[in-house]
Amino acid sequence: MFNLNFNPLAVVIAVIAVIIGFVALSVIVMYNRFARQAQLVAESWHGIDVELTRRHDLVPNLVRTVAQYSAYESSLLDQLTRARESAAGHRGDSPAVRAEFEDQLGTAAASVVARAEAYPDLKASANFQELQRQLAETENQLSFARQYYNDAVSTLNKLVSTIPW
């Protein structure tokens, strides 16, 4: 009926081929997983970059608005402008280096907004209130983007440090 004579060499070759195929498939799956996670990290960093750019774009408007009402706060406005220029000059740096300069910009912007309390006319200005709202919204979006980035990096680090991937 059936010829059950197996060639032992053919069986060994078939088993080796299956093992090689399984290993190759495993390597491809692992590589794709790493590539997807690395892409997610890059995309999440771009989300942070978008919000940082938005914050950078709001600073000149804030400086102009505050300067109209408070001629005596020029040192604070100069500090904010310098912090913005410094942060913008480090766009291509690593996230850690850039974060340091962005934190300085955030602190300078918060100082200007806090100092505005001393100027009731400025505080009541619709333009200033809108800028405050936009800055607060940007900071919230930046916080969410940072959390998303941190989660993506954490997942990538776990993939790198565990076996099997």
What is each PLM-predicted segment?
Residues 2-165:
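A helix-centric hydrophobic-segment signal that preferentially recognizes long
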